[in-house]
Amino acid sequence: MELLTFKDVAIEFSPEEWKCLDTSQQNLYRDVMLENYRNLVSLGVSISNPDLVTSLEQRKEPYNLKIHETAARPPAVCSHFTQNLWTVQGIEDSFHKLIPKGHEKRGHENLRKTCKSINECKVQKGGYNRINQCLLTTQKKTIQSNICVKVFHKFSNSNKDKIRYTGDKTFKCKECGKSFHVLSRLTQHKRIHTGENPYTCEECGKAFNWSSILTKHKRIHAREKFYKCEECGKGFTRSSHLTKHKRIHTGEKPYICEKCGKAFNQSSTLNLHKRIHSAQKYYKCEECGKAFKWSSSLNEHKRIHAGEKPFSCEECGNVFTTSSDFAKHKRIHTGEKPYKCEECGKSFNRSTTLTTHKRIHTGEKPYTCEECGKAFNWSSTLNVHKRIHSGKNPYKCEDCGKAFKVFANLHNHKKIHTGEKPYICKQCGKAFKQSSHLNKHKKIHTVDKPYKCKECGKAFKQYSNLPQHKRTHTGGKF
């Protein structure tokens, strides 16, 4: 009697079909095929180790290997899940073929007894517990005797439509218009819009929108770091993380922005960078309608509506809505100035301040007055200038009613009423209301006389004294 071979129970995939499966489905396929092979070996069938088995054990892609010659068929559909069907008679014959002479007395004669009736045949799959404890033929598609068993029961029922693959992207997201080849990919994509995270880690409670991400996350708790960097010895839970890490040592930046030419060592960083060039804002606030390019920006913005200020300064007790504002504030206490001008060496505690400072060296004045065309290197200076045209003096003294265009001028004016003199000379102890007055006073204590007359060479400590002196040369006319 002819024995059932591994070729008879093996299932092939084309590259297109293999891509239809997600990671969990590919792993399931590997488990089932290896279990088929082990079952044949355990029954005493003498077979060589097929290339497919070797490939599966090494976790290589199986679609490049040929188990046996197959008839040509049109590409593009994951058809194995609807074509690889066994009739009841075929199952019984196949299990008889698996039992060569001499093996009946080893306990295999009970295999047939598992089928109680033609309408309710149970085929025990031994190691297939991860798919189903048994395959009930009453739930399967009718062929010939109206009852058949599909090899991949799990795929055939719950995922048949989800893994259908066509050359076109037929599954479209109604929210953003993005299209997908596979329905399951669309289902997963929709979770971005809904915020659904159905897969929860039992260890820490963190939730994910993909089961594969949860599986990878679990390695953090298991402390499994299979992938080690040969350069520095650092370990990683994922091979992709090791690949990205290696670029730190090599300096490789393979992902280049087509708009500006900037290069990145990770594709995800490039994708985030591209949003700078794009006007599209994916994340919208439900409270006020304001949109953002990054989800992190939206999350920080939401704190404004909630009144939440989770970042508190231990030095002064000041609280902040965002971590970036808190980090900037800390530099006031530490005196840290990490942003240095390459032209003059002056340092600043904020990158934005350095950017505006550089305009002194470049002469750039990007802010232009629409009324008179005058240009300024700071937006704040332009705003103050506009008040000349509007006649507005928004800053009013509550004591005397005098109004000012600039808040700093109001602040200095208030000192007249309070008598406050916060600026004190360290040399003589004299106090002044304004810092500019103190700077002028300091010149008394120095021998420096920066203001020199071109006519006679006489020098003065204060600029106001120079114009008065010049009148002596002009006969009192200036």
Swiss-Prot record:
Taxonomy, superkingdom: Eukaryota
Protein keywords: DNA-binding, Metal-binding, Nucleus, Repeat, Transcription, Transcription regulation, Zinc, Zinc-finger
Molecular function GO labels: DNA-binding transcription factor activity, RNA polymerase II-specific; RNA polymerase II cis-regulatory region sequence-specific DNA binding; zinc ion binding
GO biological process: regulation of DNA-templated transcription
Zn finger region (C2H2-type): 171-193, 199-221, 227-249, 255-277, 283-305, 311-333, 339-361, 367-389, 395-417, 423-445, 451-473
Entry-linked Pfam families: KRAB, zf-C2H2
InterPro entries: KRAB, KRAB_dom_sf, Znf_C2H2_sf, Znf_C2H2_type
Subcellular location: Nucleus
Transmembrane portions of the chain: none
KRAB domain boundaries: 4-75
Statement: the UniProt record of this protein carries the keyword Methyltransferase: no
Function: May be involved in transcriptional regulation.
Protein name: Zinc finger protein 718
Gene it is expressed from: ZNF718
